[in-house]
């Protein structure tokens, strides 16, 4: 994504930055508020499974989602891109946080 040059609401950037910060910042919530929102209604069984997943599982999932991330027309991304990818963004943020927590818990147990 770093080498994929695009615009975000007419501002030059790259696709990696859009996923790392621009879509998150566009929610206009604090990080705590956004984390609480993402956690709302998630099944505990799913959360526990994600905590136990290994790095290989995560990398395969990322590969499978790659086409969705690159599915856009033109080079000026905005509201439509958010609409198409917000649920995936939130899922990956949640999975990343849980998997990091699970890994750290296993290391320091």
Task: Go through the PLM ranges and name each one.
Residues 24, 105-109:
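Sec-exported extracytoplasmic/periplasmic mature domains
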Residues 100:
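Divalent metal-coordination and catalytic microenvironments
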Residues 5-91:
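An amphipathic alpha-helical core segment
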Residues 1-3:
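Active-site beta-strand/loop microenvironment that shapes enzyme catalytic pockets
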């Amino acid at each position: 994504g770093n080498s994929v040059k695009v615009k975000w609401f007419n501002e030059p950037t790259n696709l990696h930055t859009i996923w790392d910060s621009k879509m998150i910042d566009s929610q206009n919530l604090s990080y705590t508020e956004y984390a609480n929102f993402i956690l709302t209604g998630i099944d505990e069984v799913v959360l526990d499974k994600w905590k136990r997943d290994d790095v290989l599982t995560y990398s395969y999932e990322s590969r499978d989602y790659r086409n969705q991330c690159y599915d856009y027309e033109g080079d000026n991304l905005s509201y439509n891109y958010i609409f198409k990818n917000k649920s995936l963004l939130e899922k990956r943020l949640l999975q990343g946080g849980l998997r990091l927590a699970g890994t750290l818990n296993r290391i320091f147990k």
